[in-house]
């Protein structure tokens, strides 16, 4: 009896979309009311003339189909922030997050997710892709790999288009891209791929990549032999490049010293 009840609860909370090409499932994870957001804005001294609080915001976790570096299908995930009780068609905004080593993502009113919520409460449909290999997605994350970042954006756009149709949400086809740190790199990658390969499907209204890695080779050449604060970035990048391009002749792990090699 308990097992049947548990299955019923799961089936009610998760919505599967078998008829769609990209959207696999979605689940409402949270609602932020206007009152909560106004209080948060006041607490952090955010002026409403900068970021108006117009709507409460529902947050959905979206599971969708994307692609691995070899072209095979892979599941990816992201959060989707939807204004509550809005009228008319709304623009779409993608916010790309910075470097994250942990796979898990939780909905929270902090970090770049505040940016998504700020856009959503002002009347935008806001997407927050976790990137392939992070969140509820399959495989491991390919760090700073432009193709992987771009596909996580483009395929999530396709998934939320199917979600919008299912939920009766209207988009006005304006598309804004932004992101910070690795998210700036992902923003440029997505904009470039849309412009070069998918310009009949999507039109980017504007993009704002922020503080991205402009020159990874040049910067790493200057710091990789010195002590610096974020030692995990270089192996994260090297292992991702090896997965994507198979560039190392032999075992890539031989470049790391012990005891770090065993940990990595």
Predicted regions and their residues:
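Catalytic-loop region of hydrolases
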Residues: 18-87
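Serine-hydrolase catalytic-loop signature spanning alpha/beta hydrolases and amidase-signature enzymes
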Residues: 100-102, 126, 159
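Alpha/beta-hydrolase active-site loop
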Residues: 143-166
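Primarily recognizes the serine-hydrolase "nucleophile elbow" in alpha/beta-hydrolase
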Residues: 159-229
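Accessory cap/linker subdomain of secreted extracellular hydrolases
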Residues: 210-264
């Amino acid at each position: 009896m308990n097992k049947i009840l548990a299955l019923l609860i799961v089936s009610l909370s998760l919505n599967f979309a078998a008829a769609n090409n990209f959207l696999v499932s979605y689940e409402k994870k949270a609602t932020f009311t206007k009152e909560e957001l106004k209080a948060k804005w006041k607490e952090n001294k955010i002026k409403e003339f900068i970021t108006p609080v117009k709507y409460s915001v529902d947050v959905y976790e979206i599971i969708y189909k994307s692609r691995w570096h070899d072209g095979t299908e892979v599941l990816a995930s992201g959060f989707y922030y939807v204004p509550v009780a809005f009228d008319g068609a709304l623009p779409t905004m993608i916010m790309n997050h910075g470097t994250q080593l942990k796979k898990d993502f939780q909905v929270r009113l902090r970090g770049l997710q505040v940016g998504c919520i700020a856009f959503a409460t002002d009347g935008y449909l806001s997407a927050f892709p976790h990137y392939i290999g992070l969140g509820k997605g399959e495989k491991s994350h390919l760090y700073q790999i432009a193709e992987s970042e771009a596909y996580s954006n483009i395929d999530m756009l396709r998934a939320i288009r199917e979600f919008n149709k299912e939920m009766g949400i209207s988009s006005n086809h304006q598309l804004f891209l932004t992101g910070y740190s690795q998210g700036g790199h992902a923003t440029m990658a997505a904009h470039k791929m849309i412009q070069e390969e998918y310009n009949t499907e999507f039109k980017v209204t504007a993009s704002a990549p922020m503080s991205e890695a402009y020159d990874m080779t040049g910067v790493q050449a200057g710091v990789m032999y010195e002590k610096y604060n974020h030692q995990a970035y270089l192996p994260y990048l090297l292992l991702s490049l090896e997965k994507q391009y198979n560039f190392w002749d032999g075992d890539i792990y031989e470049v790391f010293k012990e005891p770090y090699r065993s940990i990595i």
